[in-house]
């Protein structure tokens, strides 16, 4: 919003000279970021994004936008949602001489695909699932093609943690590593800078589905991921193919500790320096589906029939200190990486969520 705020205020300033800059391009610039928020109006913290940035902080801009675009229904909806959390006491509200009807619940916004940025937002009621496949992001990019985040309407249960302060050692050694993102790590290495490809996107009233591939993140390995969200159920299928054997680590960065009925064994993770950030690691060796409870959610893990796999859990640096209003939603300063590990040429992991 840093440049967008300047553009909007400039457009408002030149109106006195009968210059109208409130065109379709500016309209789309205002709609796009607001369309990508979670149900609690916080933004996913992609790349070097600071965790806890909220649409509520921009409500004054949407007061202007609503007025200049003739009480546009979407901007009116944005204002209604923001004023669920804050009072309408901004100076811009005095200029926008309309009454904003109060609402007490989140309006159901549709699933969306941001083609240029390269990510999708699947929505079902207040449930949101995001998949990121697009351009690397230059100097602020993270090696996290096909990474996901899951928001249950109250908070993230699978998180994209964004960045910590740049001077903190964990910035480059943990938060900017593939391992700290909910995607696939191969042979304990970071993904290469690349751009993935969208294969399909469909939006429904009660969810949607998306599939994308990342053929260039690891030499000789092709990755593909498909998400299907319908009501309160999510199916996540990730596949990888290669002519050679690899160590595949399917990772989910959880905000709550997963609870299993099966016990495990202590393991020390030292596959690469980034793995050293995961403490108190436990491994469970499996050859059949495994289920766990994550807060209020339930998840089932399946791999290809007959294939042995390991489920590794532990603790690692979590959502960085920043916006206190959002951090209060999380009980712990840690995140809880869940790693499904397979050593083979091919990988197919299916997780089914109910949340």
What are these regions (language model features)?
Residues 2-157, 343-344:
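Carbohydrate-active enzyme catalytic cores, enriched for enzymes
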Residues 164-355:
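CBM-like, beta-strand-rich accessory domains located in the C-terminal region of large
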């Amino acid at each position: 919003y840093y440049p967008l705020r300047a553009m909007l205020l400039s457009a408002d300033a030149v109106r006195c000279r009968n210059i109208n800059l409130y065109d379709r391009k500016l309209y789309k610039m205002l709609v796009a970021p607001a369309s990508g928020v979670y149900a609690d109006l916080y933004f996913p913290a992609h790349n070097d994004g600071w965790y806890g940035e909220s649409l509520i902080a921009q409500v004054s801009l949407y007061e202007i936008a609503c007025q200049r675009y003739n009480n546009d229904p979407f901007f009116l909806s944005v204002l209604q949602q923001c004023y669920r959390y804050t009072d309408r006491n901004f100076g811009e509200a005095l200029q926008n001489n309309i009454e904003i009807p109060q609402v007490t619940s989140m309006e159901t916004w549709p699933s969306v695909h941001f083609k240029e940025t390269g990510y999708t937002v699947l929505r079902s009621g207040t449930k949101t699932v995001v998949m990121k496949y697009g351009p690397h992001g230059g100097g602020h990019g993270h090696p996290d093609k096909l990474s996901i985040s899951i928001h249950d309407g109250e908070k993230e249960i699978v998180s994209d943690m964004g960045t910590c302060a740049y001077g903190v050692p964990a910035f480059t050694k943990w938060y900017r590593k593939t391992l700290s993102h909910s995607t696939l790590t191969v042979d304990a290495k970071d993904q290469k800078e690349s751009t993935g490809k969208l294969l399909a996107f469909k939006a429904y009233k009660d969810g949607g589905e998306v599939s994308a591939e990342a053929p260039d993140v690891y030499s000789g390995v092709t990755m593909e991921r498909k998400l299907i969200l319908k009501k309160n159920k999510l199916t996540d299928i990730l596949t990888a193919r290669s002519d050679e054997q690899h160590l595949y680590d399917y990772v989910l960065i959880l905000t709550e500790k997963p609870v299993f009925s099966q016990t495990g064994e202590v393991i020390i993770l030292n596959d690469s320096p980034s793995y050293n950030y995961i403490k108190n690691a436990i491994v469970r060796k499996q050859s059949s589906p495994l289920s766990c409870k994550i807060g209020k959610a339930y998840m089932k893990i399946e791999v290809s029939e007959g294939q042995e796999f390991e489920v590794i859990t532990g603790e690692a640096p979590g959502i960085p200190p920043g916006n206190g209003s959002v951090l209060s939603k999380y009980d712990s300063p840690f995140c809880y990486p869940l790693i499904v590990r397979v050593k083979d040429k091919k990988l197919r992991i299916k997780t089914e969520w109910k949340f």
